[in-house]
Amino acid sequence: MNHTIYTDTEKNAIRFSNFKQLEASCAFTGLGVKYVAAGEEIYYANGKKYKVKVGDYIIGNEFTKSLVQINSAEAVQGLCIDISSDIISEVAEFHDVNGSELKEFLLSDQFFVNRYNVKNTSLGYSLHEINQKIKTGVFSNDLQHNELFYSLAESIITDQRFVFEHLTNLDFKKNVTNEEVFRAILHAKLLIDERITE
């Protein structure tokens, strides 16, 4: 089951999914977030495999070519949020000290598709909170204005600005090498964060 919670003419959307079995192409609109609330989803995005477990999410944009697979005895629940390119552009331009470089990074084929954990990002708290409100049926009041999507865009840009700044400082000849080294650094940071919180 894929249930649309909210959609508007500006291409902002929130959907809640609940599947045991699924294999389908998975489009990202504007800047899209796929959050796993229960179970595990496997994404193949731009030729790379991501196991997205409960509490994790993946971010992509319109250039991200993706396939999702779910194969579980228990229901796998997910939250899909699309934030329009216009909102991302507006918020990125406000935060970008280097002209349009951050906006270009976020909305082009240069975007760094990756899996993140809600505990380690600005966006994570919002995703967890939205999911809880949807499950308890108290979410509709938050959708009176576009403020929610601007707030989510702010969180994404806070997180992705860190990624952008560090990724552009890596100086390997191939972009793929920069991305793999940075993924390894992020994974090491995640392991350290998990050990500290134990």
Q: Where do the protein language model's features map onto the residues?
A:
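A short, mixed-charge helix-start or loop-turn motif at secondary-structure junctions
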Residues: 20-22, 112, 170-174
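N-terminal regulatory/effector-sensing and dimerization cores
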Residues: 2-105, 135-143
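Short, conserved glycine- and acidic-residue-centered signature motifs
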Residues: 29, 151, 181
